[in-house]
Amino acid sequence: MITCYLRYTIDPYQLEAFERYSRMILPLAAEYGGVHHGAFLPHEGPNNIAVHLFSFPSLAEYERYRTAVREDEVAKAAWRLAEETRCILSFERSFMRPMFANEP
């Protein structure tokens, strides 16, 4: 399993727009074979950092998701919203291997 850690730098004055974007994007991972662990929005600390975490069985499955989502109408609408509102200033994508307490 791989987990994608997607760190956004957002416009804090467009937080509501970013929340709308997130609500549109969140269900898509599950529709294409992954698990979305949620959107994590600013609360304490920097007011311009948000994170999405989602997992796929493999990097190959994630790449299939990336290909499929490019044609998804909900994803296209979310990206348009982000572009029009400029709620996302930049983002960084990292891939991690989860480790759980009950695993050797």
Language-model region placement:
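Residue-level signal for secondary-structure boundary sites
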Residues: 14-16, 60-62, 101
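Long, low-complexity, Ser/Thr/Gly/Pro-rich intrinsically disordered segments that act as flexible linkers
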Residues: 89-104
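Short acidic/glycine-enriched loop/turn segments that link adjacent beta-strands
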Residues: 45-48
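An amphipathic, aromatic/His-enriched active-site/gating alpha helix that lines ligand/cofactor pockets
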Residues: 20-37, 55-92
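Short beta-strand-to-loop capping motifs
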Residues: 7-12, 54-58
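N-terminal secretory/targeting leader peptides
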Residues: 40-43
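Short, surface-exposed ligand-recognition loops at beta-strand->loop->(often short) alpha-helix junctions
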Residues: 10-20
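Short, structured motif recognition centered on aromatic/hydrophobic residues
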Residues: 2-7, 18, 29, 50-53
